Amino acid sequence: MKQYKDLCRHVLEHGEKKGDRTGTGTISTFGYQMRFHLQEGFPMLTTKKLHFKSIAHELLWFLKGDTNVRYLQENGVRIWNEWADENGELGPVYGSQWRSWRGADGETIDQISRLIEDIKTNPNSRRLIVSAWNVGEIDKMALPPCHCLFQFYVSDGKLSCQLYQRSADVFLGVPFNIASYALLTMMIAHVTGLEPGEFIHTFGDVHIYQNHIEQVNLQLTRDVRPLPKLRFAREIDSIFNFAFEDFIIEDYDPHPHIKGAVSV
């Protein structure tokens, strides 16, 4: 995708060397935005092969409200293993905040259910927001949320989503995040009777780890190929009824996978 290659070039050309929590070191910039028109194809990177199974199962895991890696491991997904404790627990991470946010008065709020109801009944609302940044529980999380807040917007029968990501690993994380939130937007559009609009990806600290520079430069030498298409295998009326088998990716023809170490 041209938008992704432009992001890589921007960070390499304008970023500054910074230390970071992991000790790896980064080239970092602050503030950047990409836009993807979902009618033009499913924005899954073609300059390297992505593991769609991991993207889809992680999103389904979030939507279940699950915070234990057991479900992921049972489905061949290992992307959260490094942060889990000996029992597979991660603390109140994304799934917990999306589905059972704990308010100050002890009330539990299902943000996803509330969001979908609001899209159906009050599509012009400016409060179509889900937040994973629960300040009162951050210290209990294995990893504070990187993609921490997203908002929906309905216009002309189309549903658009804007994500704010406070911290973005350009090589490993960002390609997953793009595809994940594009998929979520398409799923919510489907169950609310809307068409997919745009996915808008807004970054805070967007960085390339020092040990990923070679891989990023390799991607920049590769041509951008046509985007794949994503469709659903059946009609589904609830966001919580989707299964992995419902996602059909067509015409995905990426360049080969590129390995890169995760900084923990």
From Swiss-Prot:
EC numbers: 2.1.1.45
Pathway this chain belongs to: Pyrimidine metabolism; dTTP biosynthesis
Protein name: Thymidylate synthase 2
Localization annotation: Cytoplasm
UniProt family annotation: Belongs to the thymidylate synthase family. Bacterial-type ThyA subfamily.
Any one Gene Ontology molecular-function term assigned to this protein's record: thymidylate synthase activity
Subunit organization: Homodimer.
GO annotation (BP), single: dTTP biosynthetic process
PROSITE patterns given in the database record: THYMIDYLATE_SYNTHASE
Species of provenance: Bacillus spizizenii (strain ATCC 23059 / NRRL B-14472 / W23) (Bacillus subtilis subsp. spizizenii)
Designated gene of the protein: thyA2
GO cellular component, one term: cytosol
Residues reported in the UniProt entry to bind dUMP: 21, 126-127, 166-169, 177, 207-209
